[in-house]
Amino acid sequence: MLAGAPGTGKTLTAEVYAESEGRALYSVQCSQLGVQPEDLEKALLRCFARCGRWNAVMLLDEADVYVHRRGDDLTQNAVVGVFLRVLEYQSAVLFLTTNRAEDVDDAIASRCIARLTYAVPSPADQARIWRILADLSGIRITDRTIRAVVARSPALTGRDVKNLLKL
């Protein structure tokens, strides 16, 4: 499970893992699976079957609705229950991303082999991100300019930097 603010590298982690293993990444948006328990179960089983056929790594992006801590909402509880039941019998490598790690159901969290939390980059890390992405994009930018941008916008994520360099 990969948790953190948007743009901090969760999806990139799954992409890099799949590439390093020489496997395809099957990225699934939660909106594709539905929120009704019976629809979710069928859709998840289809996705896992595809991963098996393709030997793919699965990324379930923004999985918050399926991993949310159970409470008084019976439908939500059923969704989490279906998700748990389907996961229990799968062998595929699955990356789940969430922006709300504090709300993850304990039963889901206990089934995750690894849980990584991503923070907004520190100013020093942000400067390194600027340098690396600018160099990869062939954009000439001085270290002085990078320091000035970081000083004025210390909460930018890697995705923010990437998008700004496209301007």
Where are the model-predicted features located?
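C-terminal helical "lid" of AAA+/P-loop NTPase domains
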Residues: 150-151, 159-167
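Walker A/P-loop NTP-binding motif of AAA+ ATPase domains
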Residues: 1-147
